[in-house]
Every structure is written in structure tokens, then in C-alpha cells.
Amino acid sequence: MARVTVEDAVEQIGNRFDMILVAARRARQIAVQGKDPMVEEMNDKPTVIALREIELGLVNAHTLDADERQTVREREAAEIAAVAAIAEGRSL
């Protein structure tokens, strides 16, 4: 697929504005946070990869929210373990 049409992604999300927000969040995850793409990269930029994932129904606002909640839970668990280790006087 050489080009991604925004219309295909809009159909998956429901409206153009929500699609833009979801695509931006997912592209940021791929570009900045180091998340792995769910589709083949094919030398595409993160925004195009995000649109392709949306078009295929792999990503939506709910999946991004769930992923973010899981990341927060993991980070909090690591912080709690670090505080417990410090309180017990042992190093990580």
C-alpha cells in the first residue's frame, strides 16, 4: 500500500477529529516512546504507520487508553518496589 487514505481511518474511528487525536497519540508512541508498530513499517513515518494501524482496526482510543493504563500500573509497581527496597536498606 503506497498511500494511506485518511477516509479509511476515519471510518474506523467515527469522525475526523477523534481520528487525528488517536493517530497523533499512536504516532507519538511509536516515534518517542519506542513502541513497536503492529504493522510492517515499510520505511513509513510514524504518522503513516499509525494511520495504517487505525485503518486495519488495530488501534483506537480504547486500546490506547488501556495501553496507557497498563504502562502506568507497571511504572507504579516499579516505584513501589524501589521504595520498599530503600526502606529495607537494600539496593536495587
From Swiss-Prot:
InterPro entries assigned to the protein according to its UniProt record, in alphabetical order: DNA-dir_RNA_pol_omega (IPR003716), Pol_omega/Rpo6/RPB6 (IPR006110), RPB6/omega-like_sf (IPR036161)
Annotated disulfide bonds: none
Top EC group: transferase
SUPFAM superfamilies found in the cross-reference section: RPB6/omega subunit-like (SSF63562)
Keyword Cytoplasm: no
This protein's record includes keyword Nucleotidyltransferase: yes
Superkingdom, natural source: Bacteria
Family designation: Belongs to the RNA polymerase subunit omega family.
Alphabetical list of NCBIfam families matching this protein: rpoZ (TIGR00690)
Described purpose of this protein according to its UniProt entry: Promotes RNA polymerase assembly. Latches the N- and C-terminal regions of the beta' subunit thereby facilitating its interaction with the beta and alpha subunits.
UniProt protein name: DNA-directed RNA polymerase subunit omega
Gene this protein is translated from: rpoZ
